[in-house]
Amino acid sequence: MSTVTPPRTPRRLGAGLAATAALGALLAAAPQAGAASPAPAARPGDLLTVRLDQLLPTQPSVGKDQIFYKLGRYGSRKDEQAGDFNKRFDDWCETNGQGEAEKVPSGARLADPTSFTCEIPLGNETDESRAAMKIVVIGPGGSLYLTDGHHSLTSFWEAADGGPETPIRLRVQADYSGLSQSAFWDEMRAHHWVWLRDEQGAPITTGELPTRLGLSRFHDDPYRSLVYFTRDIGYTAPEDAAEYLEFLWGGWLRERLDLGAYDLDDPASYLRAVRDASELMVAADPDEVIADGRTAAELGRLDEWNDGKKAEKGEFGKLSQPLTAEKPGKLAFALDYRSRIVAPPRCTTTLRGPRTGPLVVDSGVTCLDNTRQTGPVVVRAGASLVALGSELTGPVQAVGARDVHVCGTTIDGPLSVVGSGLRTEGPGCSANSFGGPVQLVANTRG
């Protein structure tokens, strides 16, 4: 098994900022994007041990409700109350090619795999356990491109005991480290190993892909979430599943089902959406082409809704269980977690991609969405800044700002926020990385 040795991590915001943190800002540092050491040469099928912060996404969006389900369950005691280990340990072991968790002592943490034990020892992996692992392609310069597992690994990233430095093993799909960037992306497109459509189904370029994992780096595709909840109700993933299968079904459903007609904050209404979507999938002709030349049968369409079981049974019955049940359904966990997320203010101006020069926000709400900003950023009194999944090089200053909402963002320069509404952590807000001095004074929680 080949191993990628993680580089030394930049300093964390620690004791020197204790007084600042007490003002309401928890600033969890993560390594700079792109700072990871390149992977060694590898052959298809090799297993690489990596850190989550070394991985480059190959899709711009995720179904966030799927991740909210995982995070809601990871933070719950329901599994332990039922006599099981918390699902996050089973998920990590499975993703690492080691089956399920075998021993999970008190104090075990995802970020430290030596603190718990999986049922399959390292080196004893089976074909079945290897098949459950997530996939990576080695790109130019040894960069690591994740082609499967964005939802699972983002869940580990956002888990309270996980984070960007959590290690995991991935199975190598191909080594294109010797190719140029242009030839590399040609190969990725030819093999359908990259998803170049946004959350509305519109095409994007490779330059618009996120540069690292984390909830705040991805856009939300509600149809991708919907397809996740229809699994084993309207379709089941075949053994030779198409790449990005759930996005293919999601695009098909987007043309046939208006999610705006449902209240996705209400469990009963969301369940109706799942039922309506899954019934459409089952009603499709097996030979109907859904997307990319794939038929409904090839994408796992079930012959009978809910696999022939009554609504109160099978997967739909499980999905319907409320949070108060002994075994809550996935929807209940997802909606409970989502209810705890503080939404950023609505954008009046949105900036994306590379930008050079000073940025002065003097009114309204300016949103930096996966923006690479080079130059000072100033937020005037009464104005708001939202930075999601962005990389800022230069000083950032806000005095009397209405809101400063920073999640999943790297700031390489001094940060000063005074007398403002400030949010840098909490459910749904990915950890930030700060590479300069930080001054946070007399702020309120935004």
Could you tell me what each predicted segment is?
Residues A42-T117, L122-D127, A132-V136, P140-S143, ...:
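Surface-exposed, charge/polar-rich loops and edge strands
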Residues W92-E94, T117-E119, R346-T348, T366-L368, ...:
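Sequence contexts marking disulfide-bonded cysteines in secreted/extracellular proteins
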Residues S143-Y145, T366, L385:
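Hydrophobic residues embedded in beta-strands of well-ordered beta-sheets
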Residues M1-A36:
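Secretory targeting and sorting signals
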Residues R346, R352-T356, S363-V365, T374, ...:
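Tight coil/turn sites that cap or link beta-strands
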Residues D362, D369, T374, R380, ...:
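Feature marks extracellular polysaccharide-active and adherence modules
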